[in-house]
Amino acid sequence: MFGKKNLKWLGVVATLMMTFVQLGGALVTKTGSADGCGSSWPLCHGALIPEFFPIDTIIELSHRAVSALSLLMVLWLVITAWKHIGYIKEIKPLSIISVGFLLLQALIGAAAVIWQQNDYVLALHFGISLISFSSVFLITLIIFSIDQKYEADELYIKKPLRRLTWLMAIIIYCGVYTGALVRHADASLAYGGWPLPFHDLVPHSEQDWVQLTHRIMAFIVFTIIMITYIHAVKNYPNNRTVHYGYTAAFILVILQVITGALSIMTNVNLIIALFHALFITYLFGMTTYFIMLMLRSVRSDKQ
């Protein structure tokens, strides 16, 4: 059960499960299904199996079930990884972070159901779950990198790219928070057309300000990632890990911008909105991978 041969498929399945947790949370918010089980948690309308199953109850129950299964899968993964590849420096802290933030995510979700938190607190939920996802994602990448197909262990990242990548990570996380706030504040269609309502640029409500703030953050995110991408491919042309990694990040942010624009143009089409959540999830995951490589470079400086 905890054999080393299970590591790769466990990593893939756990990463996919965490992806479904992210998408499930976005689906709950987008469809207004957060109250699908009333104010009961972990029960649903005070029962293990509710008497009626309207669509919002099905969505909320499904999200809870996937979250519970993902916790079990992540526990299985981290125990196996700790046992067999715990000698790799990042495995143990990533294991603790992945489980810890997954539990914290569940507690915040439960608090939101029971005590009805305000939008600014609820917006933290997606960001916290994103940290848990990224930790699982990194464990999986480490498992596959043991084969050293891309020689990532020998990669040395210089200070200019390190600074840009740290800035990129911080800006992305701020953008994630504002995006989650847009969903929770029901501001997806606020502040007129995209990219700006040129006929009336002045925000007139809190929702307008939330939406405008997110658009500004999205523009900053795109700009920083584009600058970082150009720097990376220009200065590391022969390193496949950097070249492919930052290229993938740039493609993901382009897709993120496109789906963000289409969400507004289509009056928040659900499929497009879920792709919007998917792209930012993997963009942040890629960014945390760059940070892990950077920290290895910092350690090599000290040796």
UniProtKB/Swiss-Prot annotation:
Listed GO CC annotations: plasma membrane
Catalytic reactions on record: Fe(II)-heme o + 2 A + H2O = Fe(II)-heme a + 2 AH2
Membrane topology per record: Multi-pass membrane protein
Topology feature Extracellular, residues: 30-67, 115-125, 185-215, 266-270
Domain of life: Bacteria
Pfam families from the UniProt entry: COX15-CtaA
Binding residues for heme o: 63, 125
Record bears the keyword Transcription regulation: no
Residue positions binding heme b: 214, 276
Transmembrane segments: 9-29, 68-88, 94-114, 126-146, 164-184, 216-236, 245-265, 271-291
Positions of disulphide bridges: 37-44
Signal peptide: none
Pathway info: Porphyrin-containing compound metabolism; heme A biosynthesis; heme A from heme O: step 1/1
Subunit structure, as described in the record: Interacts with CtaB.
Domain notes: The N-half (TM1-TM4) and C-half (TM5-TM8) domains are connected by an intracellular loop. Each domain is formed from four-helix bundles and they align in a pseudo twofold symmetry manner. The N-half domain is the substrate-heme O binding domain and the C-half domain is the cofactor heme B binding domain. The cysteines of disulfide bond Cys-37 and Cys-44 may be involved in transfer of reducing equivalents from quinol in the membrane to the active site of the enzyme.
Job description of the protein: Catalyzes the conversion of heme O to heme A by two successive hydroxylations of the methyl group at C8. The first hydroxylation forms heme I, the second hydroxylation results in an unstable dihydroxymethyl group, which spontaneously dehydrates, resulting in the formyl group of heme A.
Name of the protein in its database record: Heme A synthase
